[in-house]
Amino acid sequence: MSLSGPRIGRAHQQQGDTMAINVEPALSPHLVVDDAASAIDFYVKAFDAVELGRVPGPDGKLIHAALRINGFTVMLNDDVPQMCGGKSMTPTSLGGTPVTIHLTVTDVDAKFQRALNAGATVVTALEDQLWGDRYGVVADPFGHHWSLGQPVREVNMDEIQAAMSSQGDG
């Protein structure tokens, strides 16, 4: 069993006396939070996450968990400073996060509201953007930022550049 992503549920191939693991390249965010169990509950409520599994350490803190959000794997664990050179790695302890996790969704208004109802706060209000998406950003209760966007109109690069240029005229 793997809690690392796309190979979950994939068939393995027999090679001699050993099983070869069928690995598919992937990119998955791995979030560090205070209270990973509560974070899992939040992500289920806010983003309709499906829990793939969790691994508690001897003290009950989660040393690893995996979720499926919007069709992709997101991994997370409780903050374990001793695994990071003695440093806490949560967004709260670091004074914020430079990373925003983006979800392209359908019915962005409902999904944005669902995240707010689950306890997220607005970072950037949901609005139609010059690049053609209806887009907004929320912060989860654990300090991670999530942008939600839905393409609502086709635009070309000339339109985007013209819109950017006109923003300076004012």
UniProtKB/Swiss-Prot annotation:
Protein name per its UniProtKB record: Uncharacterized protein MT0910
Domain of life according to the entry: Bacteria
Disulfide bond annotation, renumbered to this chain: none
Pfam families named in the record: Glyoxalase
Domain VOC: 25-151
Record PANTHER family: BNAUNNG04460D PROTEIN-RELATED, VOC DOMAIN-CONTAINING PROTEIN
UniProt organism field: Mycobacterium tuberculosis (strain CDC 1551 / Oshkosh)
